[in-house]
Amino acid sequence: MNHVKQAVHYWCSDTIEAMNNGRDVCVAVLDTGLAMHPDFTGRVIGFKDCVNGRHGLYDDSGHGTHVTGILAGDGRAYRGLYGGMAPKARLVIVKVLDEGGEGSIRQILEGIRWIFKNRLKYGIHVVNLSVGAKTGLEEPKENELLHAVEQLWDAGIAVVVSAGTYGPGEGTVAVPGN
């Protein structure tokens, strides 16, 4: 993030002390999981594995750990130099993608439904969904995925989804990012 701040000549000095550090916020990350890292110590409050059904926290890809670091790493491992956007947020990790970054609609829906069912238990405010269905998904499945995402939104949860996973060309932004 520091490289971005340098590039745009903005260091957030006007907001650095504001209450936008993730305190009192819970973020659910649906991705490849999370490898335990010092930057997340004491803040992972829930885990669900929709791919392999395991119970212990893990990430067999690294993508989920990277995304979670951008969102909520506290910079502890680097003496505070490299932290995420919400370094005090509590985290719920839902593994919906395998080691190759692939996942089925069934796994993604299972993860979204688990988040919806457990939203009050964990106090989930934000969901990050780093997935995009391949273009050409059958319309009933596309609608089911969109409905599940909209159900989270209608419950008052801010939902952030990836867009452009398959490139910048026309038709490459797939559901749910479209």
Show where each model-derived region lies:
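Autoinhibitory propeptides
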Residues: 1-18
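Short, well-ordered amphipathic alpha-helical segments that serve as non-catalytic structural scaffolds
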Residues: 7, 74, 110-112
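Subtilisin-like serine protease catalytic core
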Residues: 15-28, 32-46, 54-106, 122-125, ...
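Substrate-binding/access-modulating region of protease and related hydrolase catalytic domains
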Residues: 96-178
